[in-house]
Amino acid sequence: MLALKLSVYSVVFFFIAVFVFGFLASDPARTPARKDLED
């Protein structure tokens, strides 16, 4: 049961981290000054 809880928490934390990273990187990535970081 502990392994199941840890796996669920890890998946939830992974999706939250991806969502937060995509939300923070979406606006600066569209500006011409930050285009060099996308390569």
Curated annotation (Swiss-Prot):
Topology class, membrane: Single-pass membrane protein
Primary localization class, coarse: membrane
Cysteine pairs bridged by disulfides in the record: none
GO cellular component: a single term: plasma membrane-derived thylakoid membrane
One of the Pfam families matching this protein, by short name: PsbI
Localization of this protein: Cellular thylakoid membrane
InterPro entries: PSII_PsbI, PSII_PsbI_sf
Transmembrane segments: 6-26
Keywords, in A-Z order: Membrane, Photosynthesis, Photosystem II, Reaction center, Thylakoid, Transmembrane, Transmembrane helix
One BP annotation, GO: photosynthesis
Listed PANTHER family: PHOTOSYSTEM II REACTION CENTER PROTEIN I (PTHR35772:SF1)
Assembly mode: PSII is composed of 1 copy each of membrane proteins PsbA, PsbB, PsbC, PsbD, PsbE, PsbF, PsbH, PsbI, PsbJ, PsbK, PsbL, PsbM, PsbT, PsbX, PsbY, Psb30/Ycf12, peripheral proteins PsbO, CyanoQ (PsbQ), PsbU, PsbV and a large number of cofactors. It forms dimeric complexes.
Recorded family membership: Belongs to the PsbI family.
Role played: One of the components of the core complex of photosystem II (PSII), required for its stability and/or assembly. PSII is a light-driven water:plastoquinone oxidoreductase that uses light energy to abstract electrons from H(2)O, generating O(2) and a proton gradient subsequently used for ATP formation. It consists of a core antenna complex that captures photons, and an electron transfer chain that converts photonic excitation into a charge separation.
Full protein name: Photosystem II reaction center protein I
Species assigned in the record: Prochlorococcus marinus (strain MIT 9303)
